[in-house]
């Protein structure tokens, strides 16, 4: 005997045998795809970008002065600069400028683009280093070993944080940092590894050319990369690679 569905005054359906009738099949909604995290860059307010760029470049200049005044060893790029100066007899400023231009040529295959931050890098840092050295020479005319160690280590940390700050503003990296970000983008290697490889390579070339070398140079070469990597978590929400 077939079950026939009959209506109920209470608003639900039953069959002639008293069993509840099967409800109409419900159409299941298609699952909504969850957004992929990290698929789009995190936007940074333009004011913050400008302030972060400026503070990062000022900090970079101060950190450079701290390393130079420490007497414990020059930074890797400074070792290379000094080596070329010793071999060629050219003025230090011209060597720095020439290396910067050569490094920017390497941007072409890496598809890096200069920006306002690239120009600001050259201007601001050069304007900050000399006044910072003037202040340090008056506060610590001849730093003893403990003070020199503090300046070298503090300069390494400050330079790493400052690098993450002005590169993270994504207004255009400096010549040397553009090389770093370009290699990170092309190789997929972490920032700390690319930064360390670059610094070690530059140190070796500088020493071979006769540049000054010290323990602080080694600490800087191996330590600044991890500092940049950690600081970038807060100062570079969109990452250190790519374009604005």
Model-derived features with residue positions:
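Extreme N-terminal basic, low-complexity initiation segments
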Residues: 2-6
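Core subunits and conserved enzymes of cellular information-processing
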Residues: 9, 14-244
């Amino acid at each position: 005997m077939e079950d026939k569905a009959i209506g109920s005054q209470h608003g639900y359906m039953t069959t002639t045998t008293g069993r509840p009738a099967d409800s109409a099949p419900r159409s299941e909604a298609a699952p909504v795809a969850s957004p992929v995290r990290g698929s789009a860059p995190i936007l940074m307010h333009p004011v913050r970008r400008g302030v972060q760029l400026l503070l990062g470049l000022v900090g970079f200049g101060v950190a450079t002065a701290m390393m130079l005044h420490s007497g414990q060893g020059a930074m890797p790029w400074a070792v290379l600069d000094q080596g070329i100066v010793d071999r060629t007899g050219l003025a230090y400023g011209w060597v720095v400028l020439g290396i910067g231009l050569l490094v920017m040529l390497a941007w072409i295959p890496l598809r890096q683009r200069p920006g306002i931050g690239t120009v600001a890098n050259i201007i601001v840092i050069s304007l900050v280093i000399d006044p910072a050295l003037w202040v340090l020479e008056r506060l610590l005319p001849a730093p003893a070993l403990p003070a020199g160690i503090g300046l070298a280590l503090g300069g390494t940390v400050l330079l790493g944080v400052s690098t993450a700050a002005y590169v993270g503003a994504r207004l255009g990296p400096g010549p040397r940092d553009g090389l770093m970000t370009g290699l990170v983008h092309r190789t997929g290697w972490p920032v700390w590894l690319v930064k360390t490889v670059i610094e070690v390579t530059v140190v070796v070339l500088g020493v071979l050319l006769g540049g000054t070398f010290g323990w602080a140079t080694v600490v800087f070469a191996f330590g600044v990369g991890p500092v940049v990597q950690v600081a970038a978590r807060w100062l570079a929400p969109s990452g250190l690679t790519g374009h604005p």
